């Protein structure tokens, strides 16, 4: 069986919206709801679980600086390295309501970087810039089974996967989070097995170590030529996973592997 993603291009547009709601899903994951008239015509596809946007975080409401969209539909990124634009990061679209013009984004709460610290201090009325989506990826929905390896950063996309796949889809997922308090409720069908892995157990684990161990010990029966495997976590862990999976290419079609580096540790 041949399985593949289908990519759909979306016209690029720069928008802004304001925070209208903040909700903590867990001690480490916060949902922020944005709303604004510029979200009219937003390029959200309900069957694209990995669809994402670039969020721009202005230092003040009057200091939102985003690239210009050129006549050919591309973005003018000149000067990005010199700080021409507001700080920006990629984030998964968790939900979009085209009637209410609201956009939900889930943030991992941490002290490093841009998005996490912003989310910790976010308040109603704050403004964000929204760039994209540029294109969306529709995954196959006809695999015999699905295997997932995710962490907090890819948990919003995985939650969308569970909503997109057919209710009868057979799914095995390993989800690495800090501890049991970081679990969140996930909608899913009857044939879904969720394996929560806790870094804080046993004296603490390096990010991604539990996910890689789960992959190493993955039962052979979990893989077939009709399996679709999606992993999204730290870049170095993804590289190790790729090497491991390439050694199993007699069990799973390499074209059915979708491994994405969602973030990278700074050494």
How would you label these PLM feature ranges?
Residues 1-267:
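Extended, composition-driven regions rather than compact fold-specific motifs
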């Amino acid at each position: 069986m041949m399985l593949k993603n289908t990519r759909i291009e979306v016209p690029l547009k720069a928008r802004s919206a304001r925070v209208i709601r903040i909700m903590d899903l867990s001690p480490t994951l916060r949902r922020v709801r944005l709303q604004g008239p510029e979200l009219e015509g937003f390029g959200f596809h309900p069957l694209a679980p990995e669809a994402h946007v670039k969020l721009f975080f202005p230092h003040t409401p009057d200091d939102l600086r985003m690239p210009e969209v050129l006549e050919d539909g591309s973005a003018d990124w000149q000067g990005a390295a010199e700080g021409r634009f507001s700080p920006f990061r990629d984030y998964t679209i968790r939900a979009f309501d085209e009637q209410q013009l609201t956009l939900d984004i889930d943030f991992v709460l941490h002290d490093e970087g841009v998005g996490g610290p912003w989310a910790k201090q976010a308040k109603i009325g704050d403004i964000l810039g929204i760039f994209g989506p540029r294109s969306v990826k529709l995954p196959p929905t006809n695999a015999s089974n699905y295997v997932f390896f995710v962490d907090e950063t890819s948990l919003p996309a995985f939650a969308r996967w569970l909503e997109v796949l057919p209710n009868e889809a057979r799914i095995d997922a390993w989800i690495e989070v800090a501890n049991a308090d970081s679990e969140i409720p996930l909608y899913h069908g009857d044939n879904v097995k969720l394996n929560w892995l806790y870094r804080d157990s046993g004296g603490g684990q390096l990010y991604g170590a539990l996910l890689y161990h789960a992959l190493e010990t993955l039962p052979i029966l979990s893989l077939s030529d009709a399996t679709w495997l999606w992993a999204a976590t730290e870049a170095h862990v993804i590289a190790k996973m790729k090497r491991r999976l390439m050694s199993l290419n007699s069990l799973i079609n390499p074209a059915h592997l979708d491994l994405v580096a969602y973030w990278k540790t700074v050494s």
